Amino acid sequence: MGGIRGVLHHMQRTAVQASPRALGTITSRWVPGAPRSSGTHPFRKSLAELRVGDSVTAGPRTVTLADIEHFAEFTGDTFYAHTDEEAARANPLFGGIVAHGYLVVSLAAGLFVAPEPGPVLANYGLENLRFLTPVKPGDELTVTLTAKQITPRVDADYGEVRWDADVTNQRGESVAKYDVLTLVAKEQRQPDSSR
């Protein structure tokens, strides 16, 4: 077996060991444990300015019982773990009312999104979403968003950015982890002065 097929076949059995910083350099992807860079909110940076490892930490935001009840009523997701204290307490995983996972993700977005127009053009999805620790009323959420992979599109004025999102509670436990996928302008757009 020759060519790229042979190389890929061989690589399936190859392990690369290195520090997180070295792995990030080799793969052009941020990996947990690699350095993060803060400063300017990364959603304010164009693709040309953005670097793997650019990061923002936002929060805390306290989750209230009213938040959970409103989300259940508004979305129609009235699963008993979010609405019935007695039944939720009997569940061995929860021990009482817990927040919806999608409420946690929505609150995290509310913490890290920069609302003004800028180089981030669109959020086009989430991948690898996992809910790791139940969130109860009174828990405080903080989110760290880190540029994980930057992929310019050859045929467009924007590229794709994959962000590592880690939502933690007041004890530093990860409650949700996922990748946020965005489309980001290659260059800062100038405001339209004709208005």
Explain the meaning of each model-derived region.
Residues 6, 13, 70-73, 110:
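Charged/polar, solvent-exposed surface patches and flexible loops
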Residues 91-99, 103-149:
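Hydrophobic beta-strand-centered segment that forms part of the acyl-chain substrate-binding groove
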Residues 2-52, 135-140, 144-195:
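HotDog/MaoC-like acyl-thioester-processing domains
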Residues 30-99, 186:
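Catalytic strand-loop segment that frames the active site of acyl-thioester-processing enzymes
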Residues 2, 62-65, 102, 106:
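Alpha-helix N-cap/helix-start motif at coil-to-helix transitions, marked by capping-box chemistry
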Residues 67-70, 104, 146, 164:
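General structural feature for long, well-ordered alpha-helical segments within catalytic domains
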